[in-house]
């Protein structure tokens, strides 16, 4: 039984999330954005 709403919806694929930050992380799967860099090897991560 789902007890919460899913107000945050992806405008690309329509997947819904309960929190804005979950949607923000999901959007990165579409855009390829990798904003976090490793301080040791400089690789970027989402």
From Swiss-Prot:
The record's annotation in PROSITE patterns points to: ZINC_FINGER_C2H2_1, ZINC_FINGER_C2H2_2
Q: Which Pfam families match?
A: zf-C2H2 (PF00096)
**GO molecular-function terms, A-Z:** DNA-binding transcription factor activity, RNA polymerase II-specific; RNA polymerase II cis-regulatory region sequence-specific DNA binding; zinc ion binding
Per UniProt, subcellular location reads as:
Nucleus
Q: What is its main location?
A: nucleus
Where are the C2H2-type-classified zinc fingers? 1-4, 8-30, 36-46
Give the intrachain disulfide bonds. Answer: none
Signal peptide limits: none
> Which UniProt keywords are present, listed alphabetically?
DNA-binding, Metal-binding, Nucleus, Repeat, Zinc, Zinc-finger
Q: What family does the Swiss-Prot or TrEMBL record give for this protein?
A: Belongs to the snail C2H2-type zinc-finger protein family.
This protein's name: Escargot/snail protein homolog
């Amino acid at each position: 039984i789902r007890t919460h709403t899913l107000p945050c919806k992806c405008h690309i694929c329509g997947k819904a999330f309960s929190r804005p930050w979950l949607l923000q992380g999901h959007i990165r799967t579409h855009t390829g954005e990798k904003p976090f860099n490793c301080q040791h090897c400089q690789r970027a991560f989402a």
